[in-house]
Amino acid sequence: MSKEKRRVPKLRFPGFTEDWEQRELAELCNVYDGTHQTPRYTNSGVMFVSVENIKTLESDKYISEDDFKNEFKIFPEFGDILLTRIGDVGSANIILDNIKRAYYVSLALLKPKGVNSLFLLALLSSASVQSEIWKRTLHIAFPKKINKNEISKVIVSKPSILEQKKIGELIYALDQIITLHQQEPFLCENSVNDGVELC
């Protein structure tokens, strides 16, 4: 097979030579969307997240335990991924705790099956997958959106599970370093007040 036809990245970890396989996203994860009902907010209970919470996965909005049990038979768990699908389309984050969360229809829930969660997160941010998401987004809608079934049809490429693990862990670590450096100006400005030299 010629190099032009092989599905392999230009850069990869040593020891891996196999072609990457093309799959629809539905083969790598189950895709769900959040509640379509207007939430009945409470002062405490189960955290309720929406598209604006994708960066931190934290919110000061809550719904009752009863509403959560009634409306969320399937909910985000450790290792799952939330993906924005209305307004802001295609931003993703991974659940790395055991906090209960309810989520709105503006988010899609991706439950990985047979794929490394961190690799899937990295894959969703890649240029090729973002292009696939962009092509399947309804840009004439206001706000723009991608339907749940279209997310499932997004074409992705995947290597062996061992290579997935290495790639996912590396890219996640790099993302954490980048985030830390982006916060440094804020930390430097506040270090004098706290009496701690951070810079």
Predicted feature residues:
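Short, tandemly repeated low-complexity microdomains enriched for cysteine and small residues
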Residues: 23, 60-61, 180-190
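Acidic/polar-enriched heptad-repeat coiled-coil alpha-helices
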Residues: 168-172, 176, 183
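DNA target-recognition domains and sequence-specific DNA-contacting regions of bacterial/archaeal
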Residues: 26-158
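Short sequence segments immediately N-terminal to proteolytic processing junctions that release a mature
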Residues: 20-23, 167, 178
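Non-catalytic DNA-recognition/assembly elements of restriction-modification systems
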Residues: 11-35
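Short, recurring structural edge motifs at helix starts
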Residues: 1-2, 11-15, 37, 141-143, ...
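Short amphipathic coiled-coil heptad-repeat segments
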Residues: 1-18, 183-199
